[in-house]
A protein has these predicted regions:
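Short helix-initiation/N-cap motifs at beta->coil->alpha
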Residues: 13-24, 36-40, 161, 186-196
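Extracytoplasmic/peripheral linker and loop segments enriched in polar/acidic and small residues
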Residues: 86-94, 102, 179, 183-194, ...
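Short helices/loops that flank or line small-molecule/ion binding pockets
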Residues: 20-30, 44-48, 168-180, 192-203
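Ligand-binding "clamshell"
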Residues: 43-57, 200-203, 216-231
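Alpha-helical secondary-structure segments
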Residues: 7-10, 28, 59-113, 140-142, ...
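Aromatic-rich, solvent-exposed beta-strand/loop patch
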Residues: 1-21, 42-62, 137, 160
């Protein structure tokens, strides 16, 4: 720090909204650096003479939420809310081939997660960050056990301009859930409308991404899992988790605090 180790004398910022145009400008030498290049273009950029790709994982986890509070899905056909049953939620989980999404949609530039946080965050527990296996047969059996042997209908709400390949991920999920009889209609729209309607409790089944700028698990629990929290749109509520959140806010002993966080992760 303090020692000049570059040859930059001036920086000009040139907003280029269209991703393809940004990449073309880079490859033609019109500009020197681009940010947020499309994942499908990274190999082409990397193989182009004089260009180098630098990447690092985002501090954000993308997940699909299911409203467990309403008695009847707004977009369903069963007259009730299948998401109230753990077996149904687990069935959808195990019907999603996360490795296929990583390989085909994200071109290898994603990391499957078992919890909504990541290494480096205070309270992260590696043992809990393990996913159940992708298993279509097990998912079908779980649906049958829950009383939905023929599946059901539901709408999946996604943004199409907020996260990397957000709509493409949702499109892949639609096909995967169809294999277990869950007929998903995709409703993708601009982020401004998506988040406003989600805040207004209009989503039965939705995509959301959550970062942890504080690098502390409390940020996740306070906004996503605390009873009545502003972004707790799955309407999860558990007195033990709420009590653990109070411990996170007041406990100064790190070992005790991390134990409370780990216990909360086990519950959710």
């Amino acid at each position: 720090w303090g020692n000049v180790e570059h040859n930059i004398t001036e920086i000009q910022l040139l907003p280029i909204k269209n991703a393809a145009t940004r990449v073309a400008a880079l490859l033609s030498g019109e500009i020197d650096i681009v940010t947020d290049a499309p994942v499908q273009d990274l190999a082409r950029i990397s193989s182009s003479a004089g260009h180098k790709v630098e990447s690092t994982p985002q501090m954000r986890t993308i997940f699909l939420g299911m409203d467990q509070a309403v008695d009847q899905l707004r977009s369903g056909n069963t007259g009730d809310n299948p998401f109230k049953k753990k077996e149904v939620r687990q069935a959808l989980y195990q019907a999603i081939d996360i490795e296929a999404i990583k390989k085909k949609v994200m071109r290898g530039l994603s990391e499957p997660a078992g919890i909504i946080t990541f290494p480096g965050v205070t309270g992260y527990t590696k043992e809990l960050d393990e996913r159940l296996p992708y298993d279509v047969d097990a998912a079908k059996q779980l649906l049958a056990d829950a009383g939905y042997p023929d599946g059901f209908e539901v709408e999946l709400r996604c943004p199409n301009d907020r996260y990397v390949n957000d709509e493409a991920i949702c499109t892949a999920v639609v096909g995967m859930l169809g294999k277990i009889g869950v007929n998903v209609s995709l409703f993708a729209q601009t982020k401004s409308k998506h988040f406003k309607e989600l805040k207004d409790n209009q989503g039965d089944f939705y995509m959301l991404g959550w970062g942890v700028p504080t690098l502390d698990s409390h940020y996740v629990f306070h906004y996503l899992y605390e009873s009545g929290a502003s972004w707790n749109k799955v309407n999860f509520s558990d007195a033990e988790v709420d009590a653990a959140i109070r411990v996170m806010e007041g406990e100064v002993n790190l070992e005790k605090r991390n134990a409370a966080i780990a216990n909360a992760w086990k519950i959710v």
